From Swiss-Prot:
Lineage of source species: Bacteria, Pseudomonadati, Pseudomonadota, Gammaproteobacteria, Enterobacterales
Role summary: Transcription regulator that can specifically activate or repress expression of target genes. Required to activate expression of virulent genes.
Domain of life according to the entry: Bacteria
Species whose genome carries this gene: Salmonella choleraesuis (strain SC-B67)
InterPro entries for the chain: HTH_MarR-typ, MarR/SlyA-like, Tscrpt_reg_MarR-type_CS, Tscrpt_reg_SlyA, WH-like_DNA-bd_sf, WH_DNA-bd_sf
Keyword flag Transcription regulation: yes
Residue intervals of the HTH marR-type domain: 2-135
DNA-binding region: 49-72
PROSITE patterns to which the protein is assigned, alphabetical: HTH_MARR_1, HTH_MARR_2
The protein's assembly and partners: Homodimer.
Gene Ontology molecular functions: DNA binding; DNA-binding transcription factor activity
Protein name: Transcriptional regulator SlyA
GO BP terms: response to stress
Length: 144
């Protein structure tokens, strides 16, 4: 019988995020909010909403709702792009900086605890294998 690898990977991502979600509860961030803030922080400055949606792997309308909420909380700002008035550039605000620092610390610490007992060579191999799987899936999508 074949291993349900896809289901295993989906479950792993779900429980990994659930653990971080639980640990970030004191910061009053939903999973959607912290995933979005984390991606904004990780990407180069002044990303567009389109680039951010691609990085997170969600549709733009879903992202817009989240960005509206983060903007209402004063954590991000959006400016119209000078070269394309339809595009919006996203920036973290000063108010977001201490929250991002605390959030990133929790994420980094949790990642370290999750990967405890796994060698750096094993982690590198896993990263390469996941990249190959992603490449294969993207190739299949391009042919369909």
């Amino acid at each position: 019988m074949e291993s349900p690898l896809g289901s295993d990977l989906a479950r792993l991502v779900r429980i990994w995020r659930a653990l971080i979600d639980h640990r970030l509860k004191p910061l009053e961030l939903t999973q959607t909010h912290w995933v979005t803030l984390h991606n904004i922080h990780q990407l180069p400055p002044d990303q567009s909403q389109i680039q951010l949606a691609k990085a997170i792997g969600i549709e733009q309308p879903s992202l817009v709702r989240t960005l509206d909420q983060l903007e209402d909380k004063g954590l991000i700002s959006r400016q119209t792009c000078a070269s394309d008035r339809r595009a919006k550039r996203i920036k973290l605000t000063e108010k977001a900086e201490p929250l991002i620092a605390e959030m990133e610390e929790v994420i980094h610490k949790t990642r370290g605890e999750i990967l405890a007992g796994i060698s750096s060579e094993e982690i590198e191999l896993l990263i390469k294998l996941v990249a190959k799987l992603e490449h294969n899936i993207m190739e299949l999508h391009s042919h369909d």
